[in-house]
UniProtKB/Swiss-Prot annotation:
It comes from the Eukaryota. It holds the Pfam family Hydrolase. This is Haloacid dehalogenase-like hydrolase domain-containing protein 3. Belongs to the HAD-like hydrolase superfamily. InterPro entries: HAD-like_hydrolase_domain, HAD-like_sf, HAD-SF_hydro_IA_REG-2-like_cap, HAD_sf.
Length: 189
């Protein structure tokens, strides 16, 4: 039995954050006149992210949020936990950071990703990118990075923050009309 499709997750498989989040938040805060500690921002981000993920899973979709609002709230909470008091400036920082993470400049190709994609392409394997990360990685960063060269960038229904666990793979199977025991997990115990 041959493989008919290889799916790749976007975040931390093909792309990763270029520099630690605390440093990126620090740089934007400094640019807008806030004096913050990058280490504190990193710790606060991890706490805010963990709390928000627990309270509003899948970017708050079940609670009527979109990923933009979810991320803005995480950034606002991050700065509050780090002691920022200027809400107006923090909101401006949050808006800018959301935009910045929508660009390729804040993302880096994971070492080995290009080579893995090249190898799969050389073998004639069909590939798709799926992710339950928010839709920003489907936009510009994804178009500029390795998968675009190999997969003819296309949004699949599986690339949805609402699709978690196995559902994301089932959606990719449906999108490519590949039914039956054709996935690696079906042929390798």
């Amino acid at each position: 039995m041959s493989l008919r499709l290889i799916t790749w997750d976007i975040k931390d498989t093909l792309l990763r954050v270029r520099v630690p989040v605390g440093q990126q938040y620090f740089a934007e805060a400094k640019r807008q006149g806030l004096c913050m500690d990058p280490g504190s921002l990193e710790t606060s981000f991890r706490n805010a992210y963990r709390t928000h993920s627990r309270l509003f899973p899948n970017y708050g979709l079940a609670q009527g949020m979109d990923s933009r609002q979810w991320w803005l709230d995480v950034v606002l909470q991050t700065f509050r936990l780090s002691g920022a008091e200027d809400d107006e400036t923090v909101r401006s920082v949050a808006q800018q950071l959301y935009q910045d993470f929508s660009t390729a400049r804040n993302w880096a190709v994971v070492p080995g990703a290009r080579e893995a994609l090249d190898s799969c392409k050389g073998l004639g394997l069909k590939m798709a990118v799926i992710s339950n990360f928010d839709r920003r990685l489907e936009e510009q960063p994804m178009k500029d990075e390795p998968a675009a060269d190999h997969m003819g960038y296309k949004r699949y229904p599986a690339a949805s923050p609402g699709a978690g666990g196995a559902a994301v793979f089932c959606r990719s199977q449906e999108a490519r009309s590949l039914y039956g025991p054709r996935f690696l997990g079906d042929i390798v115990p």
